[in-house]
Amino acid sequence: MIRSKGFTLTELLIVLALAAILATLAAPNFRDFVRSTRMTSEANSLLLGLNLARSESVKRGQRITLSSTSTNTSWTEGWDMYDDTGVAGTKDGTDATIRVGEAIDPPLTMTGAANVVGYQPSGVLAPVPAVFTFDLCESDRNGETGRQITISVTGRVSIADFLCP
C-alpha cells in the first residue's frame, strides 16, 4: 500500500481554527503595544529636543527656546527650537532655527504648562518656574495611562507615566 504524505483537509481546518482563536486573543494586546510604543516614541522625541536645547544653550552661551507652533499651550502641531537672541520667548528676525519638531499624529495630543520654554546659558530653565510639564495623552482614551515629560528647575528632563484627564 502506498502512503501519501501531507495533511488532510480536517487537520488543516483544525489548525486554521486554532490560529484564528490565537489571533483574536493576541490582537488587543498587540494594539495596546503599538499605542504604547507610539506614545513612548513621541515622548522620547520631545525629550531629545529638550536635551538638545539645554546642551546648545550651554555650548553657545546664550538662551535657547522651544516654542509651540500653535499660539496656545498645545504642542500637538509641533515646535520650533531657536537661539533666542532677540526678544526673550518670541521668535523674531534675529533668531536662527536650530531644529523643528514634527506634528503629532492623532489621536495623540500634547499640552504644556505654557507655549514657550527656554534654557539659560547655564542650562537651567528660563524663566525659572518650579517645574515645567508636558502631558502626552490619547484624545480618545481618557483615564488611561499617558506620558508626562517634566523639566526640573535645574533643566533636567524626565519621563513618567501618569493618568490622562
Regions found by a protein language model. Name each.
Residues M1-L25:
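Glycine-centered recognition micro-motifs in short, flexible terminal segments and loops
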Residues I2, I21, L25-S55, K59, ...:
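N-terminal helix-rich module
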